[in-house]
Amino acid sequence: MTAVVACGHPDSAADDVSRCASPDSSKYTSELRKSDLPWSGGRSPYNAEAKLDDGRRVAMYYLRNKGLVEQHYSPRAKAWTEANLIHRTEADACQGIELRAKHGTVAAIADFGPYCNDGEPPAESIAAVGVDSLTEWDINVTKDFDGWERASVSDDGSEVVFKRNTTLRWSRADGFDDQ
């Protein structure tokens, strides 16, 4: 398992678990991008979007040979931020992306694996949490795990619980639990 904090810089994924500054330094000058993975039929599971209580939106999507990408939207600016790579991997996207938002906290679930297109389970299960300005994301990578089934954000946004047959907890005070 690896804990990573991405601090709003394109392609950032340092092995530093220290907190970054939280003020919103985002520049809202872009349009929303979408996953470059092909999908036929209805809505692509490789794109996800959630609305926050204050009208902002956050979107995540997979990019082939890059990883998990995030953008957020300001209703005041009527624009999106530049794409921010929050987890780099060249493995295939598995399953879809799930986003939950409550009281300024956004929780995300995403999975990757080298043979997911062939039906194999994920090799990397991502639990991610962004708060307030969404310029920083706490990332937890669980290796060789079937993927988180759901994420629940507490009513006040201070805690997130990721569940499958085990539980991973995140809090504003302490970040992710040590496992």
Predicted regions and their residues:
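Acidic, small-residue rich beta-repeat scaffolds with periodic aromatic anchors
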Residues: 42, 134-179
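Extracytoplasmic low-complexity, Pro/Thr/Ser/Ala/Gly-rich segments
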Residues: 11-89
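Beta-propeller blade signature
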Residues: 70-75, 121-134
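Blade-loop segments of beta-propeller domains
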Residues: 81-113
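Repeated scaffold domains used in trafficking and secretory/extracellular systems
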Residues: 36-51, 90-100, 141-155
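Short glycine/acidic-enriched loop and turn motifs that connect beta-strands
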Residues: 62-67, 113-118, 166-170
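Secretory targeting and sorting signals
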Residues: 1-11
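Entry beta-strands of beta-propeller and related beta-repeat scaffolds
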Residues: 53-59, 103-109, 155-162
